[in-house]
Amino acid sequence: MSSSSWLGCLLAVLLSALALSQGLPLLEDLDENSFPDGRIVGGYVTDIAQVPYQITLRYKAISSPENPFRHRCGGSIVNETTILTAAHCVIGTVASQFKVVAGTNFQTGTDGVITNVKRVIMHEGYNSGAAYNNDIAVLFVDPPLPLNNFTIKAIKLATEPPLDGAPSKISGWGSTYPGGYSSNQLLAVDVPIVGNDLCDLDYENFIDETYHITSAMLCAGKRGVGGADACQGDSGGPLVVRDELHGVVSWGNSCALPNYPGVYANVAFLRPWIDAVRAGL
């Protein structure tokens, strides 16, 4: 191989490594046996009764059938048979690789209600036009979840975008710091909505032009301050404003950085697709 070819290959590897280290979806890929004390970044311990729409989506690889199902992503209960999560949580998988656990404060263990995923429908426009664009998927489960309005409850889907600056709540079992261990106990954090125009400016020089904010996304975070955010393991989970599901945890530059708000799938914008899938269209 010529020196110029070798240098070209090296540059490609370095650029790939840079991309993988920054614009990652907030997907869990950690050792589930290690849970240090701490919080979701900048957040607090919560109880499932405060966020009864929250589920843990557990997964195992087809190549390792002997392994237990383990937390991969979060999700939200739409009704007793329907869960909303992120497309990047389910891409390249089949339904039998997942179980949904509702009504639990913990990402491990057998408490709560466990049900099977029977069908996975990922947005056909995922990653089209921008990285992580249309990052949403619908899961159908069976047997149906026993909704009880206390620890297992459906959440209303937004039909209008939230106001800039509106307070929102994110919950999940994600890392308590970038690249750190996930939390075994359910955590939550409160962050304001950031307008898409400002958020797009923040990500203007991030990696390359494929990383930009589209209408199918919304942003939230303490802009210019940081310190509060979703993180790895929170993917697919809920962002809630005034008791309505407005966002699905999607991606960002690391976690809780002051100049990079977290990015979420925009439920109100994607609502026609969600409704069509639920109607079987």
From Swiss-Prot:
Keyword field contains ATP-binding: no
Chain positions listed as propeptide in the UniProt record: 24-39
Compartment list: Secreted, Extracellular space
Residue numbers marked as site, Required for specificity: 229
Enzymatic reactions: Preferential cleavage: Arg-|-Xaa, Lys-|-Xaa
Example GO molecular function: serine-type endopeptidase activity
Disulfide topology: 73-89, 199-219, 231-255
Record-level GO cellular component terms: extracellular region
Domain Peptidase S1: 40-279
Active site as annotated: 88, 135, 235
GO biological process: proteolysis
Signal sequence region: 1-23
EC number of this enzyme: 3.4.21.4
InterPro entries: Peptidase_S1 (IPR050430), Peptidase_S1_PA (IPR009003), Peptidase_S1_PA_chymotrypsin (IPR043504), Peptidase_S1A (IPR001314), Trypsin_dom (IPR001254), TRYPSIN_HIS (IPR018114), TRYPSIN_SER (IPR033116)
Principal EC category: hydrolase
Keyword entries, A-Z: Disulfide bond, Hydrolase, Protease, Secreted, Serine protease, Signal, Zymogen
Family classification: Belongs to the peptidase S1 family.
Name of the protein: Trypsin zeta
Phylogenetic placement of the source organism: Eukaryota, Metazoa, Ecdysozoa, Arthropoda, Hexapoda
